[in-house]
Amino acid sequence: MNYSFDHIRLFIAIDYSLESVGVTMFDVEKKQYHFLSYLNIKKPATASRAAMLRGIDDLTVVEYQRDPIATVKSREDGLFGWEQQHMTNVLHYNAELVRSINRVASHLIQNLQKRETCVLIENYSYSSQSDTLIQLVENTMEVKHHLLTSTCNMENFYCIPAPRVKLYVGKGNYDKYDMTTAFLGNVRSDDYIPRSSFYQYLLQNFHEHYLKERIKKGKQFNEVLSPISDVVDSYWILRYFLVLNELD
């Protein structure tokens, strides 16, 4: 890209999902990471995992509770009631997500300006088809609106294709387990990540607390439990962009 990032003081990368959003921030001057998880803790198991993450100095966990995402087909109150609740969620929770990002950013860097902030968000997978796809698009658009209003300028806003990030990390068919083990192994030789308290915590606790073996269609696979997978994915979005633009 023929664009100067000399004025950027903070990079923010976002991996968005409907129940767990992962965010990685990088302070350019201090060469330090800060991570954020915006997490629906309605399920007790998720709440327990969130509690274990408290006290990590470079990880902020913002907890909220709402009923799990449901499709129109599974709702008994019909389209009108479902749509009203859905739009209430879209407007409220995404505004709070961006407020949380801005609070952390302003704490990391005093007097941070919009023009000094670069935001990266994972692009849609246009081949995806699911009952929640439209919900994801509507939610993400609201996030983008708030980010461009209060966090960064349009010229510092980028959508990053997930396949390119996966290829950068290793292979295009990498799943969340592959991405997380690559993160823990520091496969791209990031000089700054070993300093991170979150990284060191995960090195010690990942296999015991955040990995679960499951069977799907008769095959065993390793599931990385939220919010870890989302935070790690946001880290790789950021690293891909920094390396692509020779900013690391």
Language-model features: where?
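Phosphate- and other anionic-substrate recognition elements at nucleic-acid/protein interfaces
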Residues: 1-248
